[in-house]
UniProtKB/Swiss-Prot annotation:
The gene is rplC. The keyword Transferase does not apply. Belongs to the universal ribosomal protein uL3 family. It comes from the Bacteria. PROSITE patterns: RIBOSOMAL_L3. GO terms for cellular component: cytosolic large ribosomal subunit. This is Large ribosomal subunit protein uL3. One of its GO terms (biological process) is translation. GO terms for molecular function: rRNA binding; structural constituent of ribosome. Transmembrane segments: none annotated.
């Protein structure tokens, strides 16, 4: 099991494959993705690497973190994430990981924070059909209707689909295909959509499940 990477979402575009078909892709950019610290079985009880990416201003970095970066001999990083790895995949502190870490055609799992939509109704949040447009319905056209309970059980069950806060959740999309990489510019092109807004930090790992045949 090897380390994943930290990348930043640039946006979406489309590219053409060898068959001349256009493929929608999300462009991710890697900037200064380096190993900041390591975790070992002897010292920590498990094996992992801590990666840092992006550039943070020194004045915005705490004194404790400045000390950690100084020990690793790397510039202050804007984003830190820890990845569990096997002992044979443990990287040295200061090692930089580039876009060539992934190969075209391989499958990856991508983790990001979805775009927040605020308080949303049941129609937008869950795809409900709403109530009738006429025939006695007034004001409640976009309502979710009955919550489905009466004296017994006398309550609304947890996880009932209702209006509420939508988005701004941590989501992992599995088995996305890497279309191509550009190591010189630090770009990874991933087929399809990736959770998060433009500029959001994205975690990319090797896929843990095989794709459905």
């Amino acid at each position: 099991m090897r380390s994943g990477v930290i990348a930043q979402k640039v946006g979406m575009t489309r590219v053409y494959n060898d068959a001349g078909e256009h493929v929608p892709v999300t462009v991710l950019r890697m900037e200064g993705c380096q190993v900041v610290a390591t975790r070992t079985v002897e010292k920590n009880g498990y094996t992992a690497v801590q990666l840092g990416a992006g550039q943070a201003k020194v004045k915005n970095t705490s004194k404790a973190m400045r000390g950690n970066f100084a020990i690793a001999n790397v510039e202050p990083k804007a984003k830190l994430t820890e990845f569990r790895v096997s002992e044979d995949q443990l990287l040295e502190v200061g090692t930089e990981i580039k876009a060539g870490h992934f190969a075209a055609g391989q499958l990856v799992d991508v983790t990001g924070t979805t775009i927040g939509k605020g308080f949303a109704g049941a129609m937008k949040r869950h795809g409900f059909g709403g109530l009738r447009a006429t025939h006695g319905v007034s004001v409640s056209h976009r309502s979710h209707g009955s919550t489905g309970s009466r004296q017994d059980p006398g309550k609304v069950f947890k996880n009932k689909k209702m209006a509420g806060h939508m988005g701004q959740t941590r989501v992992t999309t599995q088995n996305l295909e890497v279309v191509s990489t550009d190591e010189d510019r630090g770009l990874i092109l991933i087929k399809g959509a990736v959770p998060g807004s433009k500029g959001a930090w994205i975690i990319v790992r090797d896929a843990v499940k095989s794709a459905a045949k």
